[in-house]
């Protein structure tokens, strides 16, 4: 290997990295016929699914605050804690059947459901054959666009959802004066009324359920034509002989916070909607568009990625590109493969920016988008992986603004979680949250006494979430946020679990959880019992171990004295064990999994998204535990649901196996047919739908975000060493680079320690690098098989060039 000299200079101009990313766009040569073919738009609160039909353009509308339900009852489950000692008694007698049965007494009500706001239909009154159809979603500008010819006239529609101005806009034009003739209709699947007046449609309604106990909404659609005539009748606006037209959509709901009744204490949704409609007069369409693009690009443009060194012209429709990507008979050229892989990465960033900008209301299972009255799994917040996975790319992919809704949501959970801790578990200090939640910040176990404990009774959701918030601090280095928001949430969760731990009946010096479950998985005991409830589950202890270790670091960061009681309990936690097959045991005993390929790999949380598995291996100078994690992944296999596939990309990357991580990434990008399509060539498995939505199946957005995070993890990994007097951040560049990505460049990727990195690599070696620090920080940076220690100063820029 040629010797490389590292030329380092602070604020020096040595080698600037400017990633030349090609235009990022999804495009199609036909309208959408299914939800999974539609184009998603969102401003973080309002969402639209654009089908782009020529005779009837269906646009499903969503508002991320439009849910069933009302605030949780603080007395829900009061007295259920009495069953916990009985369950423990059964478990310690190895009577797992009785424990499973008793778990049903510690279940509460189901969570609320996320529901669609309404449907806007634009009906073309012109007739005649259509040709030259084109439909596009431009990720670089967050604009959707369709165009077609009819009777020799060129028609175009442009759509966007602006966060800055809180509206959705549609602009319709033709290249011939007076050619636009259409109906505009607004309807909903939930109870509603629509009124047409002058050039405006106003719809009021509420989610399913009692009118006096539901979230209400007011949606206003304004039609502003140039030329032509508008007639309002019933629930329809009719426009004839217009030159062009602009449609504005605004909405407000009565949702006023997790602890506010949506009717008795609801927001003034009608007044708020009317005020939003008035705002549409403040700017022209082009001005709204310019404001939208500028605000969006301030965040989106932070990260640019170029994989490979060959240009691609994007001359294949995205659905065909996706089909051929995994085809053995008509494989894509290398440049096309790299383009799709980059497009999927940026699509994940686009989605998170589009669905997570509302205070205290994070992205749900659907992100923001659903056409279904009752979405799969209620469209809720599933906290045993899915909600957490939604936010994996937020920091590394340089979109920290999107994580603020999650922080506010967890604050709400900490309030309701105190009641759950007391009523369901008999613990009066601290808080916890279970498996499913909603905007009302439900924290209690669900199931209503009849669902399987494997998912309904798990209570580690809050702990996993606060671990994610601590990780956000490591990226942001915002000590005020840590002190005022994140640390109090961590402390409350820690207090609960310090009391939840019990003495291991087999080894009195150890602490375990009881009852315990491993999310959605089932075991088979050595006596043949097929069950779900156990004690000392590995996933439980992994999350608690991560929490206590993070608490140690947080206290040190804030200058607080060590918590000796917590530290003692951390050291007493039942350790990881390795099974007879060399895998990491998921259960206290070396039991068989009912499904060895199960989608959840919860006992690997300490590897990713957690950090402690590698830390333990380093401290003990024993890699056995990492080898066991690897063997577990081998046993699991490479094919699973969409979100699980996204998780496995990151797990393999964390193990440093870039080629295997890439293989899983390829699986994630395998074509999946829309759910409503059942032709002979239909394909239904985990992967990606024609519009690049993640296929569980059905659609769940978490896999999109897991995939985007996985790309980041293959390119850059970071961790913190808190053992020294001052934290040292370890940065590893190209730690899991696939062979097929031997050349590339990225701009704007973030690391723990508050660093922003631009780099270029050739033949798997970094050739130019720029590091910008958000705060004073000590780093140990590893690349090209060498390590360098640096002290960076806030605002400083270090540029490094490899010199022969």
Residue spans of the language-model regions?
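Bacterial Sec-dependent N-terminal signal peptides
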Residues: 1-21
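Non-catalytic carbohydrate-binding regions of carbohydrate-active enzymes
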Residues: 470-476, 481, 485, 493-503, ...
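Loop/turn elements at helix/coil->beta-strand transitions in domains of secreted/extracellular proteins
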Residues: 478, 487, 508-510
């Amino acid at each position: 290997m040629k010797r490389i000299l590292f030329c380092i200079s602070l604020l020096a101009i040595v080698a600037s990295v400017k990633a030349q990313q090609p235009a990022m766009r999804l495009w199609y040569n036909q309208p959408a016929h299914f939800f999974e073919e539609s184009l998603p738009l969102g401003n973080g609160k309002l969402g639209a699914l654009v089908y782009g039909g020529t005779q009837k353009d269906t646009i499903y509308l969503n508002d991320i605050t439009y849910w069933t339900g009302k605030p949780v009852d603080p007395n829900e489950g009061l007295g259920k804690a009495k069953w916990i000692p009985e369950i423990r008694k059964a478990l310690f007698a190895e009577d797992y059947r009785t424990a499973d049965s008793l778990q049903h007494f510690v279940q509460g009500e189901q969570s609320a459901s996320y529901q669609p706001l309404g449907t806007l239909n634009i009906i073309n009154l012109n007739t005649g054959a259509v040709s030259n159809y084109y439909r596009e979603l431009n990720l670089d500008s967050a604009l959707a666009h369709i165009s077609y010819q009819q009777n020799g006239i060129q028609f175009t529609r442009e759509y966007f959802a602006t966060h800055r101005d809180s509206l959705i806009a549609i602009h319709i034009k033709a290249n011939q004066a007076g050619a636009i003739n259409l109906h505009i209709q607004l309807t909903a699947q939930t109870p509603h009324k629509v009124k047409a007046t002058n050039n405006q449609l106003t719809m009021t309604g509420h989610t399913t359920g009692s009118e006096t106990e539901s979230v209400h909404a007011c949606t206003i659609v304004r039609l502003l034509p140039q030329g032509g005539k508008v007639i309002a009748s019933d629930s329809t606006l009719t426009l004839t002989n217009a030159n062009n037209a602009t449609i504005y959509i605004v909405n407000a709901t009565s949702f006023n916070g997790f602890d506010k009744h949506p009717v008795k204490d609801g927001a003034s949704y009608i007044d708020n909607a009317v005020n939003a409609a008035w705002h549409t007069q403040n700017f022209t369409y082009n001005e709204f568009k310019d404001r939208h693009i500028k605000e969006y690009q301030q965040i989106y443009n932070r990260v640019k990625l170029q994989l490979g060194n060959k240009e691609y012209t994007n001359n294949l429709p995205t659905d065909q590109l996706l089909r051929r990507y995994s085809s053995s008979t008509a494989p894509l050229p290398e440049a096309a493969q790299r383009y799709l892989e980059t497009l999927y990465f940026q699509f994940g960033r686009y989605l998170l920016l589009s669905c997570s900008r509302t205070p205290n209301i994070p992205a749900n299972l659907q992100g923001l988008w659903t056409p279904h009255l009752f979405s799969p799994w209620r469209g809720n917040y599933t906290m045993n992986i899915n909600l957490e996975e939604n936010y994996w790319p937020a920091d590394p992919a340089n979109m920290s603004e999107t994580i603020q809704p999650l922080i506010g949501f967890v604050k709400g959970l900490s309030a309701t979680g105190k009641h759950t801790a007391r009523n369901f578990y008999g613990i009066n200090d601290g808080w916890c949250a279970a498996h499913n939640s909603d905007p009302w910040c439900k924290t209690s176990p669900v199931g209503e006494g009849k669902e399987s404990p494997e998912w309904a009774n798990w209570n580690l959701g809050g702990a996993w979430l606060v671990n994610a918030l601590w990780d956000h601090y490591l990226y942001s280095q915002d000590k005020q946020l840590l002190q005022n928001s994140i640390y109090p949430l961590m402390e409350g969760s820690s207090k609960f679990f310090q009391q939840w731990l019990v003495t291991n009946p087999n080894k009195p010096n150890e602490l375990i959880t009881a009852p315990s479950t491993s999310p959605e998985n089932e075991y088979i005991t050595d006596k043949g019992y097929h069950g779900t409830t156990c004690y000392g589950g590995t996933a439980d202890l992994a999350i608690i171990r991560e929490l206590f270790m993070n608490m140690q670091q947080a206290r040190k960061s804030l200058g607080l004295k060590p918590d000796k009681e917590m530290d003692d309990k951390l050291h007493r936690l039942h350790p990881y064990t390795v099974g007879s097959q060399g895998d990491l045991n998921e259960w206290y005993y070396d039991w068989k999994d009912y499904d060895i390929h199960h989608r959840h790999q919860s006992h690997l949380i300490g590897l990713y998204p957690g950090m402690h598995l590698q830390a333990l291996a380093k401290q003990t100078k024993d890699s056995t535990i990492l080898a066991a994690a690897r063997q577990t992944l081998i046993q699991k296999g490479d094919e699973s649901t969409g979100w699980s596939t996204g998780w496995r990309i990151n797990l393999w990357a964390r193990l440093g196996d870039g080629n295997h991580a890439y293989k899983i990434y390829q699986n994630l990008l395998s074509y999946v047919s829309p759910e409503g399509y059942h032709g002979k060539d239909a394909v239904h498995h985990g992967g990606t739908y024609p519009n690049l939505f993640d296929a569980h199946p059905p659609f769940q957005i978490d896999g999109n975000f897991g995939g985007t995070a996985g790309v980041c993890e293959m390119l850059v990994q970071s961790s913190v060493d808190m053992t020294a007097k001052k934290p040292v951040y370890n940065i590893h560049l190209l730690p899991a680079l696939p062979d097929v990505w031997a050349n590339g460049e990225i701009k704007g990727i973030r690391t723990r320690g508050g660093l922003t990195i631009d780099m270029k690599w050739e033949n798997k070696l970094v050739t130019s690098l720029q590091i910008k620090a958000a705060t004073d920080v000590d780093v140990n940076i590893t690349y090209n098989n060498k390590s360098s220690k640096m002290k960076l100063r806030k605002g400083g820029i270090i540029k490094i060039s490899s010199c022969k």
